[in-house]
Amino acid sequence: MSARYAEIGVTTNFSFLEGGSHPQDYVHEASRLGLDAIGIADRNTLAGVVRAFSEFDNEELIHKPKLLIGTRLCFADGTPDLLAYPTDRAAYGRLCRLLSAGKLRAGKGECHLTFADLEAFIHERSPSIHELATVIHPPSASINQPSASIHQFPTPSWPGLTRPSTPTSKVVLVSVDARVKPGHDGGKRVADNSQILLVVMPSYRFQTKTIAIALERLTALNADAVWLGLTPYYRGDDKRRLARLRRIAAVARVPCIATNDVLYHHPRRRALQDVLTCVREKTSIDKAGRRLEGNAERHLKPAAEMARLFRHDPEAIAETLRFADRISFTLDELKYHYPDEPVPPGKTAQAHLQDLTEQGIKQYFPNGISDRLRATIAKELAIIERRGYAHYFLTVHDIVRYARSQDILCQGRGSAANSAVCYVLGITCVDPTEIDLLFERFVSEERDEPPDIDVDFEHSRREEVMQYIYRRYGRHRAAIVATVIHYRPRSAIRDVGKALGLSEDVTAALADTVWGSWGKGLNEMQVRQAGLDPHNPMIGRAVELATELIGFPRHLSQHVGGYVLTQDRLDSYVPIGNAAMADRTFIEWDKDDIDAVKMMKVDVLALGMLTCIRKGFHLIAQHKGVRFQLSDIKSEDDNAVYKMLQRGESIGVFQVESRAQMNMLPRLKPRCFYDLVIEVAIVRPGPIQGDMVHPYLRRRNGQEPVVYPSPSGEAGDKNELRQILGKTLGVPLFQEQAMRIAIEAAHFTPDEANQLRRAMATFRNVGTIGKFEAKMIGNLVKRGYDATFAKNCFEQIKGFGSYGFPESHAASFAKLVYVSAWMKCEHPDAFCCALLNSQPMGFYAPAQIVGDARSNGVEVRPVDVSFSEGQCTLEERCGRHHAVRLGFRMIDGFRWADPDEERVQLEAGEPPSDDWAARIVAARARGAFTSLEQFARITALPKRALILLADADAFRSLGLDRRAALWAVRRLPDDVPLPLFEAASAREQEDERAAPLPAMPMAEHVVADYQTVRLSLKGHPMEFLRALFAAERVVTCREVSRSEQRASGCWLRCAGVVLVRQRPGSANGVIFMTIEDETGIANIVVWPAVMEKYRKEVMGARLVLVEGKVQASAEGVVHLVAERLIDRSAEMGRLAEGLVRPALPDGADLYEPLTSEKYNYEALNGDRRDTPDAPAQRHRHPRDVRILPPSRDFH
């Protein structure tokens, strides 16, 4: 009879920086080895169990071992580690609550458990997150629960253990309804067969007394559900060590159970596990010593091998099978219940939803609706009722209603835009019947999946909405979904380099050759470009291990806004922990995990453009007297807005401001709203990889006939794709079209199509879409479709898997494209001001936003203490438009309070921040400033704030330019308050003889502007280098696009400041750069071969000289195709010749300009003459001073 064995001690890489293999790796290896069962037991977490659970759906698994769901409990009070496995659903709920209790008293990513916690949760109900309506409060925080009782969690008391580094925390317990919910253990003692099975895991150097006491306490607590784990460590003393453990178990009368205490699925992962240990222990391989495993034996082993190792104790092997047989729980048993929304008395949720829908119809269609829309709404409501989703729609409606009541802009997007019900409820802004969107894409009776509604809110005010959800549902029923932060190329290279002992400059050089966040590793060319030898054994090993590490989970973080809401307590489904941000809690599972266990989430997302639009609307109302809402801006075909977009004038416009979109606009020439839908979707990996863009443009421009692919002969209806592809001229551009082609033309079953859709959604991370390729292409070709069309369709599907837009999503975004373009066209002053006040967002830095506004006739005025406020503002009209006044927020390092953030802080009871800008505005309201001394006296700003203002040239209205203001600030006393009645007349110091200061050259002014406010209204840095570059026959960006040069396709040299670098995944390695000089911008194309040759210049240059050939499209879009790139960033230092500055108070990273006068270091830094041993002032050469802000890089 062949040996049988169940491995119960598997540590995956969700025991972060410990396990050396993915959960999926273990499932496949256990299947290959023919194990009876495999138990996932990560350190104080259940984060990886769903990955293993989901992998059992993989058709490649021939043998499917039983999956045991558990965790490894690690304690803070000296209790030995325990493997914990729940036998049923009730026991699983208690285990989740135990983990939640430990996590909620600790900081993010930590779990502080004691044996007392185990005693409380193993059988009996205990205070859990159901009662924890408010989570951790530091001792200094105010707790707005006057009637709550405060409980201090116990602190460690065993010898030699230090107090945790986090401050003592208080958890507020408030009265919450804790009635037993159906299917849960509630508060009664559980039945004997509902147990958490516990396995004591002795360390290598265990203490006999410690293990004996633990077994005694556990058996008293858990009767027949305790085991002692036996693990061979292969260090020569296993026989003696395991014999000691058997004697301890015999005395305690508990069975022994075998486990290899697995750290990786295969021996080849041992080296990577050593690296992870070094990262965790913050050491290197040569210093780690015994913290590393002594061999490569901690891997999954076949039953025969484990039987051989335990040949003197076969019962320990047999016990693994008995242990596995006692566990019946699977994740299939998690029966999710969506929260019941309050409804009016006598109404059901469905009836209430129908009432709200009717109210929405009257609001949005006061003159009545079409029969078609009425029929669509009735159909949707019927499906919602049959699927039981009314409560979900009511939840989202309630959240949107709250946001609108607080004047927070929001808009639903994604598949929800397919729903007419969502439209009349005010959740989405696009009428799906106008562009023929498909409700079944959102909710289908054929798919047993919950709907998923994504709602965007203003990014500056989303926190208000999130806190409303916590208040509305309680923290016992609401938490944010997790996001798994994975190792990416740069972080993998850095951590592996440190672990292997490579110097910081070597790891930095390797990391700096990586573009963006995604990639598979380093190639030989990149290693050479880092100045290293790829054949060096240590370098080669580092690259190999870093490549293995890419994709490993590094830690958990909170999702950008996905909430899980439950009817009963959430911590009975999944453990909950604290986020790094105050007042945030999140679960351990990510969006794919909760999809796998069929839990519903509500996405509360942040969108910067909504903030910009709301602020723009406010400025228009304030200064022009006209009030707008999103729904008021109607798209009118072929108006001035579309004409602006046709010219490619889209800087700042949502979704169409990238280089690729700006080039597409003149080619597509949008004339109506649906053209914008296509514009948003067409510059995406799906249509590009599927080679669908050029055919669509040619057909749109009448350059080729519109034809619809069709099957041959008797294979099917010749027009079966006409209805699917009619709106896009026979060319599939949207995700829905590709899916419908799979069903209608490739004859995929609904289940296969659903699997394909899921594969598309996870392609970028998982890459499982390839298994559908042969079927889809084969079926299409078999039915007579052209093979090229079939291949292109599937390439398009793979592109959508990388990053593609469904039609409904594109339609939602197209609405914001039009609104932002309308504001840019009709109100460029308000648009510029709102964009600046909404930073950071978008493709372009403030310098380009301001430059674009000025080119459109908007006057922009500098920061000035007599006129500016914290935010940028509009001033009196200057010509057609109001002038934009830059605000104090533009000054790097200057303290100003965002009113949106202040509102959240006040609601949370936090003290207001020190707002220097508000001090200036308040002082100015009492009278005009007359001098710098008076300004300093009545604002009482610290010396550092005055230096920042002077360096930003903000005292011009007081008759002081930058140099004079800096000199005057130097003469002021340090931050020592003067007596009340002496302050008005006190002189800061003895008058100095007035010394005329040399005028600051304009080039230095521009440099200082960029250093302080990130832009200059005085000029462009390239203006002052023009003579230098002209002597080298370098042309301007404007000259690159001159008509005679476009026609000739000539060779040119052009130089400029790098604004944006892009490497789209659909461009096959091509880099697109946008550079700027004083005349405008130029688009640069860098082919992969050139990129590899000039990687350092492409990735690192702030100012670059490009040599290449002009390439122009028929629509007049011009590119310079690079053949050679030269980093000329050092030329910026020429503008700052003589600009060497000492350090300033409070660590300000600013430097005073040199003058003919001697610096008074004592005035700035205190008298240092009596401290000869004090370190010398650190100076920085001008070429090391940051002059230009970094480019904005996208991939």
Swiss-Prot record:
GO terms for biological process: DNA repair; DNA replication. Its EC number is 2.7.7.7. InterPro entries: DNA_pol3_alpha_NTPase_dom, DNA_pol3_finger, DnaE2, DnaE2/DnaE/PolC, DNAPol_HHH, NA-bd_OB_tRNA, PHP_dom, Pol/His_phosphatase_N. It catalyses: DNA(n) + a 2'-deoxyribonucleoside 5'-triphosphate = DNA(n+1) + diphosphate. It is an enzyme of class 2 (transferase). Pfam families: DNA_pol3_alpha (PF07733), DNA_pol3_finger (PF17657), HHH_6 (PF14579), PHP (PF02811), tRNA_anti-codon (PF01336). It is found in: Cytoplasm. Keywords: Cytoplasm, DNA damage, DNA repair, DNA replication, DNA-directed DNA polymerase, Nucleotidyltransferase, Transferase. Residues 1163-1195 are annotated as: Disordered. One of its GO terms (molecular function) is nucleic acid binding. One of its GO terms (cellular component) is cytoplasm. Gene3D superfamilies: Metal-dependent hydrolases. Its main location: cytoplasm. Belongs to the DNA polymerase type-C family. DnaE2 subfamily. DNA polymerase involved in damage-induced mutagenesis and translesion synthesis (TLS). It is not the major replicative DNA polymerase. This is Error-prone DNA polymerase. The lineage of its organism: Bacteria, Pseudomonadati, Pseudomonadota, Alphaproteobacteria, Hyphomicrobiales.
